[in-house]
């Protein structure tokens, strides 16, 4: 991120120039301080204790069978979010840390910022010999893609997470054939 901060800021400037709703500008802005914040957030996530394989609960059945509830990855998590570019990096890092793949669809207002952040994240995965395809970014403003994602991808996506306002959450809950968190 730090090596590519000028590239990130350049892409972010495109989003800021195209911003239709001026009240979104503060949430869209990526400057050196916010890029450092994204880097810090990713580092914190990397330092989290590995959540996979944790014994969450144990009990013994009357027939003396020992049962363990163990944390496992969910699988493929689709995340639909609004105009905060930092969410791209946070969600990709959280999904990776928890052993999950992610499909990211950010708000149209931040498409250039989200695209560069997703690209850099995938590039970092590849450099670290991790399959970059465990993070996918939907590089389109077309809302029909979201409709198709919610209604036709239930064989491929295990859970959908809407991150945004009431309107987004309501739409996802109404139209999704995939479990929604």
Where are the language model's segments positioned?
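Catalytic cores of large soluble enzymes that bind and process phosphate-bearing ligands
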Residues: 4, 27-34, 109, 113, ...
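Short alpha-helical
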Residues: 7, 86, 112, 144, ...
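Conserved small-residue-rich beta-alpha loop and adjacent elements
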Residues: 40, 47, 51-124, 128, ...
